[in-house]
Amino acid sequence: MTKAARGAAAQPLDREFIRKVNRALLAWYAATARPLKIRERSDPYSVLVSEVMAQQTQISRVDQLATTFLARFPTLESLAAAETADVLVAWKGLGYNRRALALQRAAAAAVAAGGLPSSVEALIELPGIGPYTARAVAAIAFGGREIPVDVNIARIVARLADSDAPLSPREVQLRANEFGAELADGEAGAWAQAAMDLASSTCRAAAPKCDECPLREHCPSAGRTFAKAPRSGEPRTPFTKTARWLRRRLLDELREAGRAGAQVAGERGEHNEAAVAATINKMVSEGLAESLGGDRYRLPHRGD
């Protein structure tokens, strides 16, 4: 690929180049894939659960907790019918708990429709399911050809496209789909998982290990230097002072309290009573808690 072609997102990549990259990446993945337990299950429901979990949680933690979650809610129907409180208890350790609510809503919608759909377009219509998750489920569970693109896969695609200028999300997806178009049926899911492994181990944002990369003979960006993102000059706020810490603390208290609920009043760590009250009220509005009257709250339950 010539230097002049860099950044020209409208011009398709060479098909033979794409085929060589695909063969090299899939061969590397077949030999070195991370031994993740979640990859042992490729049924649509398990893939949906693991992909929603992995949106904002490290894959090592997802791998530890997904098995337990799936044992507690082994089917789409069991998750849809569960008490939301039980789902939130099982979600402990994954963070960003609104994802658990969205996952349960998606399960309920899918059950009402007769099961998880197989197309990207239909999956996106489910509550809380965005383009990446829809493409990941379609590719991994149903053999779809569209490559799911997150920030890690976007980085690899941009480097393979030899783009000096940042590509827009649409341009990255179009480039990724060029690779998907040259894959055999059912290979797009493996390609995406391979790219995730490559991004984690080799094709890193600021310090890629090009000499260890299985694509080094084909990648036009091999050996280039990539600058680190500038750090903010402001000191980082200690986690115990953040709203996330307070939400986690209150949610854990409600998890421990069970159906009877817990008294939520007073200070928590470095957060005053007003901050605690504002946070629990927001959690109620988001569906993460429900009021029992006064200062008593619990996780959401359907009855009583």
Tell where the protein language model's regions lie, with residue ranges:
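Catalytic cores of DNA base-excision repair glycosylases
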Residues: F17, R23-A24, W28-T240, R244-W245, ...
